[in-house]
Swiss-Prot record:
One cellular component term from this protein's GO annotations in UniProt: microtubule
Alphabetical list of PROSITE patterns matching this protein: TUBULIN
Superkingdom as given in the UniProt entry: Eukaryota
Function: Tubulin is the major constituent of microtubules. The gamma chain is found at microtubule organizing centers (MTOC) such as the spindle poles, suggesting that it is involved in the minus-end nucleation of microtubule assembly.
Name of encoding gene: TUBG
Positions bound to GTP: 142-148
Annotated GO biological process: cytoplasmic microtubule organization; microtubule nucleation
Localization in the cell: Cytoplasm, Cytoskeleton, Microtubule organizing center
Name of the protein in question: Tubulin gamma chain
């Protein structure tokens, strides 16, 4: 029986990447823009019910909630050619429509105020599921709504659906460009804090710095637009869910997927790689793809969607905690075995010493309704200790602002920071620093010992933290 997943799209960025994700899923399952099954979609064997359900007239509706505090992006979706795809009861835009002003505290406070309305929508979707497995949250950590309201919803889901798994697709800001959002470091740290570290079971890191680099270097797009980077994100999202929708022998539910990648609860931030990447105008530049070629390329830095400064800093010490390669296409399992052997012989992946040093591989069918130029494609989901440098950069940028006491008045206007109470900032910094320390400790052979001593010290400050994976 399919295990259903409810998707929450929060804020401008969350709704934009969510929209691209649903477009891709419709293509892969032969569903029209109106939600009707196309006449040619007769092959079956896919699980549409994981992400869609059928209305009384048999058209497919995404199990999705579209949530924002300002109307522009959602209005765009509702006026697009996909306007009849969604359940309009699952759309929430704040009455005032003024947004969160790129302020985490505003987004969090407004989330608190509208909790009842949104949780009613979530409860209705959950009640309509036969066997709900969990939730997927799409958001950005840098602005106001996706970070603040997204944080509040993560806490609310943890309270109400503590046994359900929560995975996020979290967009990290472009660190190489000057941001329009001057308080981005505050917002990022507050979101990384308890919310993504404690209230999520798995976080797929979508690093805008790396996405822009890949668009420029790999796809030869000089000035990539948001639409083009969002297209890269939808490719990752659809590929990472392919084993749930086109099930094989393993990793055909979210719990299995997450459990295979996350041996230690807090180190649940995953980086991704995808190959081959093409855009429409490159369709003629087709090369031969093999399992070995795809798996080798997935380990190359240029194909990994996390910033180069995170991957290259102290690179000799950095290690993989786990790797899952999802290979799509007509693949002979013996080729997979030979490819893994070759990668092991060449020592292309440096693993931790305290866990299984192996690349897991899940084979998945390609959608019969989407024609691709390549015979084999692959997505890598990996837990890698170098991700800590991304978090360290967030801390460093936060400290530069905090040292100057810059823009703090914007946050003091809201209850959590009233009366100049900035403990939420201090606690957030401590939690993110402890996360950095834990990833650093993972590089050592005696990490398990560190886990027993240091982790208990770190967590004693907050007795509410439950770090166990939810049971299914």
């Amino acid at each position: 029986m399919p295990r259903e997943i409810i998707t929450l799209q929060v804020g401008q960025c969350g709704n934009q990447i969510g929209m691209e994700f649903w477009k891709q899923l419709c293509l892969e399952h032969g569903i029209s823009k109106e939600g009707m099954l196309e006449d040619f979609a007769t092959q079956g064997g896919d699980r549409k019910d994981v992400f869609f359900y059928q209305a009384d007239d048999e058209h497919y509706i995404p199990r999705a909630l579209l949530l924002d505090l300002e109307p522009r992006v959602i209005n765009g979706i509702q006026n697009s050619e996909y306007r009849n795809l969604y359940n309009h009861e699952n759309v929430f835009v704040a009455d005032h429509g003024g947004g969160a002003g790129n302020n985490w505290a505003s987004g969090y406070h407004q989330g608190e105020q509208v909790e009842e309305d949104i949780m009613d929508m979530i409860d209705r979707e959950a009640d309509g599921s036969d066997s709900l497995e969990g939730f997927v949250l799409c958001h950005s950590i840098a602005g106001g709504t996706g970070s603040g309201m997204g944080s509040y919803l993560l806490e609310a889901l943890n309270d109400r659906y503590s046994k359900k798994l929560v995975q996020t697709y979290s967009v990290f800001p472009n660190q190489m460009e000057t941001s329009d959002v001057v308080v981005q470091p505050y917002n990022s740290l507050l979101t990384l804090n308890k919310r993504l570290t404690i209230n999520a079971d798995c976080v797929v890191v979508l690093d805008n710095t790396a996405l822009n680099r890949i668009a420029v270097d790999r796809l030869h797009i000089p000035n990539p637009t948001f639409a083009q980077t969002n297209s890269l994100v939808s490719t990752v999202m659809s590929a990472s869910t392919t084993t749930l929708r086109y099930p094989g022998y393993m990793n055909n539910d979210l719990v299995g997927l997450v459990a295979s990648l996350i041996p230690t609860p807090r180190c649940h931030f995953l980086m991704t790689g995808y190959t081959p990447l093409t855009v429409e105008r490159q369709a003629n530049a087709i090369r031969k793809t093999t399992v070995l070629d795809v798996m080798r390329r997935l380990l190359q830095a240029k194909n990994i969607m996390v910033s180069s400064y995170a991957r290259t800093k102290e690179a000799s010490q950095a290690k993989y905690i786990s790797i899952l390669n999802i290979i799509q296409g007509e693949v002979d399992p013996t080729q997979v075995h030979k490819s893994l052997q070759r990668i092991r012989e060449r020592k292309l992946a440096n693993f931790i010493e305290w866990g299984p040093a192996s690349i897991q591989v899940a084979l998945s069918r390609k959608s019969p309704y989407v024609q691709t130029a390549h015979r084999v494609s692959g997505l890598m989901l990996a837990s890698h200790t170098s991700i800590r440098h991304l978090f360290s950069k967030c801390i460093n940028q936060y400290e530069k602002l905090r040292k100057k006491q810059a823009f703090l008045d914007n946050y003091r206007k809201f209850p959590m920071f009233a009366d100049n109470d900035l403990t939420e900032f201090d606690e957030s910094r401590e939690i993110v620093q402890s996360l950095v320390d834990e990833y650093k400790a993972c590089e050592s052979a005696d990490y398990i010992k560190w886990g027993m001593e240091d982790r208990s010290k770190t967590l004693s400050a907050d007795g509410t933290m439950d770090l166990s994976l939810p049971s299914s």
